A protein has these predicted regions:
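Proline-centered helix-kink/hinge sites
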Residues: 65, 135-136
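Short, surface-exposed connector motifs at secondary-structure boundaries
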Residues: 44-48, 73-78
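A substrate-engagement module of RecA-like helicase motors
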Residues: 2-20, 74-133, 140
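Conserved pre-motif I regulatory segment
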Residues: 5-49
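Walker A/P-loop
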Residues: 44-62
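Conserved structured core elements
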Residues: 28-32, 54-60, 80, 88-92, ...
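Generic, well-ordered alpha-helical scaffold segments in large soluble proteins
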Residues: 37, 41, 66-69, 101
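Walker A/P-loop NTP-binding motif
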Residues: 60-73, 96
Length: 141
């Protein structure tokens, strides 16, 4: 494994600590260990598989090192989710929190975009094909 200056790991730790504090929570040892492992894997360009239980703080555990990496390297990071529920949690709760913490700790607020696949958008062709239906028919439960 490669080595990075201690201040980089400290920035990641400070960012995580600030974000967790802003959410009214406390760091968990597993969350800190995960953030450190993600940080190291990104720097060494390695794959990493993490398994952790519900409530471990996985989202902030990977977002903190990802943001430090983005700011430090000027790189982009892609976070893909398996569910729309997790995507919404990230987009509306975890990412805004980590970005607020980033302004305080890193003096930067990286740009973030939420991208969705075509299955999450209306198909204009299909929408037009349903125009013969009345609104109550389309909206009936």
């Amino acid at each position: 494994m490669g080595s990075e200056p201690a201040d980089v790991s400290q920035m990641c730790r400070d960012l995580l600590s600030t974000a967790v504090s802003e959410m009214g929570g406390q760091e968990r040892p597993g969350q800190v260990a995960m953030a450190k492992a993600v940080d190291q894997a990104m720097r060494d360009k390695l794959h990493l598989l993490v398994q952790a239980g519900t409530g471990t703080g996985k989202s902030l555990g990977y977002l903190a090192p990802a943001l430090v990496y983005c700011v430090e390297k000027g790189a982009q990071v892609i976070v893909a989710t398996a569910t729309l529920a997790l995507q919404a949690q990230l987009a509306y709760k975890d990412i805004p929190t980590i970005l607020d913490a980033s302004e305080k700790v890193l003096s930067r607020r990286p740009r973030v975009a939420v991208l969705k696949g075509r299955n999450n958008h209306i198909c204009l062709h299909k929408a037009v094909s349903y125009t013969h239906l009345t609104l109550p028919t389309i909206c009936s439960v």
